[in-house]
A protein has these predicted regions:
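Secretory targeting and sorting signals
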Residues: 1-33
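N-terminal segments that cap or nucleate solenoid repeat domains
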Residues: 33-82, 301-302
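Extracellular secreted precursors and ectodomains with disulfide-bonded cysteine-rich loops/domains
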Residues: 39-43, 62, 118, 125, ...
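Feature marks extracellular polysaccharide-active and adherence modules
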Residues: 61, 67-69, 74, 80, ...
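Short aromatic-glycine motifs in intrinsically disordered, low-complexity regions
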Residues: 63-68, 90-99, 131-137, 154-157, ...
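Acidic/polar low-complexity surface segments
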Residues: 84-99, 115-143, 168-195, 256-260, ...
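Repeat-based scaffolding regions
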Residues: 113, 153, 181-190, 197-199, ...
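Leucine-rich solenoid repeat scaffolds
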Residues: 237-302
Length: 302
């Protein structure tokens, strides 16, 4: 997705949420008391549930948001098939004072057709309740103790995050097109997945995703990054930019890979943003991507 479209996507996410989701009352409020067992956060996109307080485990059904203070999950947080979790709010929008946050001690599990929007910062993705999304200042840093795993999700949009284990996305994505679908349709945005400005304690493994656009940007990865057989409609995908990878960077069978970002509304010109790789680069991520139309790869490393 070119720079303009990514910026527009962020703005429409923010404006749609502020105008609609934030204004609606919750259907199910997973409240502030400490709750053992499994809590269900449920609602609709027009009247989402609200997750706050401390819970043993959480299942999201329908639509749920984290915008009413601190939410702590001691076990796993599961986004059930076709559901959406919006956890990219910086403020406590229910009381009007304080901040919101999300800390999951176990795994975050995103099921088929579901969407996760988690984390935000001024530079990459404005918080959904930032009062000035054109010049954002707020941030929210979610943490996941174990893995972030998704199987056939619609989209995974995470920023400014920490995952203690692996990040694994397998399949899904809404197809090789840029047509808004599911919750993305509400935001007038193409379906996409991106992982930006985060720390990952294990591997990043993304495979068999078919979507519009994908990014892996400014991650600190303690082990290996594998991008395998991902097909994206946007020629600007997959952007793999400015990551610090302790292990290997392996890219095979993808529609295209870039270690440079587009500067304007077109595919070229591009700004090189190479990765730091501790071990080996393999497959499509060995030499730097072309800097001009029809140009060669290299000579520098990807």
């Amino acid at each position: 997705m070119n720079t303009y479209l990514r910026y527009l996507s962020c703005l429409v996410f923010t404006s749609a949420v502020v105008a609609g989701v934030l204004a609606a009352g919750p259907v199910t409020a997973a409240g502030a008391a400490v709750t053992a067992g499994t809590t269900t956060c449920s609602g609709t996109t027009s009247a989402p549930g609200v997750l706050t307080g401390t819970h043993g485990a959480v299942v999201v059904r329908g639509a749920c948001e984290v915008n009413a203070g601190a939410a702590v999950v001691n076990g796993n947080l599961t986004v059930s098939p076709g559901s959406v979790l919006l956890a990219a709010f910086a403020l406590n929008d229910k009381t009007g004072t304080g901040t919101s946050s999300l800390a999951v001690q176990g795994n975050v599990l995103v099921r088929a057709g579901a969407t996760l929007v988690m984390g935000c910062n001024p530079a990459n993705f404005a918080c959904l309740d930032d009062p000035n999304p054109n010049k954002p200042t707020l941030s929210m840093h979610p943490t996941v103790g174990l893995d972030l795993r998704s199987n056939q999700p619609l989209g995974i949009v995470v920023h400014n995050f920490t995952v203690g284990g692996d990040v694994i996305q397998t399949g899904g994505g809404g197809g090789v097109n840029c047509t808004p679908q599911g919750v993305f349709k509400l935001f007038q945005s193409p379906v996409y997945s991106t992982y930006e400005v985060g720390s990952v304690g294990g591997d990043v493994r993304i495979s068999s995703v078919q979507s519009c656009w994908m990014g892996v940007v400014q991650l600190q990865v303690a082990n290996t990054v594998v991008m395998y057989r991902n097909q994206l409609a946007d020629p600007d995908a997959i952007e793999i930019l400015s990551n610090n990878i302790t292990g290997n960077l392996i890219c095979r069978g993808n529609s295209r890979t870039w270690d440079s970002g587009d500067i304007g509304a077109h595919l070229f010109p591009r700004q090189p943003e190479p990765n730091t790789v501790g071990r080996n680069r393999k497959g499509q991520c060995v030499l730097s991507s072309p800097t001009k139309p029809g140009g060669p790869h290299g000579p520098g490393p990807f």
